[in-house]
């Protein structure tokens, strides 16, 4: 059966079949190759795309702006202080206005329900650049990188170490289930995802020969891993008491060379960034002053090692 994703929003990986995800990965690969070869064809000339951000960003904003411009479209950025979105104007009203001016909307914010409503009311495709619940565009980029280094996805052991409730971890879990990988979450039980989402992922995994598991032992999780992934343990804006309890819970799940040594010799290390792997950031220094740890979710040794592909 022919595959046609024209006009479809990209809100979460649960909405897409393995075949559709495969198509998006292949398209991403082809566009990347064409750009490097200097023969990219601009298929979006005359189109207009708006980036609607409730949260500031470096990589997400730059990636969408560059990709949109590379494809010949015009782009408008509306940051946290650049619109009345959610303050003086409802999500539905904003969606209807933007849908009449733009051909697509990219959203980065808080509630998943907001990006779902943008898609419901705008009448144009909406792309999720991060919500509290999911970060599907990040996972497309990650899986493309994994394929570039490993040759394929199916059958790989993919470990996420840290707070497995966060949007990247949950999206990776769903993505691994869809694409036939063996996802292992390394975290204390208090920081495992919702049982409902885990069960949904396990049902998907039955169809793709994937597996979904969670363990509270870092060495066990990373044994023979093909990919080890982590993310920050705390976010700015969270109260200090959350920082302390979270750091104490996750200290045993730091990605260090002990974790790398029990993985496969060609294991790759991944991180969605930013990372607190040294004292060269304001947050990193604050954490060191308060908790006495110079490195948080990953050691600088691993971050700068031959296994690290965080900038790819």
UniProtKB/Swiss-Prot annotation:
L-ornithine binds at residues 167, 231, 235-236. It is an enzyme of class 2 (transferase). It is found in: Cytoplasm. Keywords: Arginine metabolism, Cytoplasm, Transferase. Pathway: Amino-acid degradation; L-arginine degradation via ADI pathway; carbamoyl phosphate from L-arginine: step 2/2. Carbamoyl phosphate binds at residues 57-60, 84, 108, 135-138, 272-273. The keyword Transferase applies. GO terms for cellular component: cytoplasm. It catalyses: carbamoyl phosphate + L-ornithine = L-citrulline + phosphate + H(+). One of its GO terms (molecular function) is amino acid binding. Coiled coil: none annotated. Its EC number is 2.1.3.3. Reversibly catalyzes the transfer of the carbamoyl group from carbamoyl phosphate (CP) to the N(epsilon) atom of ornithine (ORN) to produce L-citrulline. NCBIfam families: orni_carb_tr (TIGR00658). Belongs to the aspartate/ornithine carbamoyltransferase superfamily. OTCase family. This is Ornithine carbamoyltransferase, catabolic. The gene is arcB.
């Amino acid at each position: 059966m022919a595959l046609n994703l024209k006009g479809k929003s990209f809100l979460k990986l649960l909405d897409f079949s393995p075949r559709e995800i495969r198509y998006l990965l292949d398209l991403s690969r082809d566009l990347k190759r064409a750009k490097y070869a200097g023969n990219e064809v601009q298929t979006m000339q005359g189109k207009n795309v708006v980036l609607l951000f409730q949260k500031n960003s470096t990589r997400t904003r730059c990636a969408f702006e560059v990709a949109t411009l590379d494809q010949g479209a015009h782009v408008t950025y509306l940051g946290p202080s650049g619109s009345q979105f959610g303050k003086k104007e409802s999500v539905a009203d904003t969606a209807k206005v933007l849908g009449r001016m733009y051909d697509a909307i990219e959203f980065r914010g808080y509630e998943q329900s907001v990006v779902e409503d943008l898609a419901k009311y705008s009448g144009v495709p909406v792309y999720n650049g991060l919500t509290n619940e999911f970060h599907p565009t990040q996972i497309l980029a990650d899986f493309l990188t994994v394929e570039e280094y490993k040759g394929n996805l199916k059958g790989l052991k993919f470990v996420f170490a840290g707070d497995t409730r966060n949007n990247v971890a949950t999206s990776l879990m769903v993505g691994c289930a869809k694409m036939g990988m063996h996802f292992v979450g390394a975290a204390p039980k208090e920081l495992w995802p919702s049982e409902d989402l885990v069960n949904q992922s396990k049902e998907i995994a039955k169809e793709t020969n994937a597996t979904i598991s969670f363990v509270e032992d870092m060495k066990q999780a990373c044994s023979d891993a093909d990919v080890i992934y982590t993310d920050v343990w705390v976010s700015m804006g969270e109260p200090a008491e959350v920082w302390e309890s979270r750091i104490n819970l996750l200290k045993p799940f730091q990605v260090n060379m002990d974790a790398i040594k029990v993985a496969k010799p060609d294991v790759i290390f991944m991180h969605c960034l930013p990372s607190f792997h040294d004292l060269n950031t304001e947050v990193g220094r604050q954490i060191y002053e308060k908790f006495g740890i110079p490195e948080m979710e990953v050691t600088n040794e691993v971050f700068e090692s031959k296994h690290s592909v965080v900038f790819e």
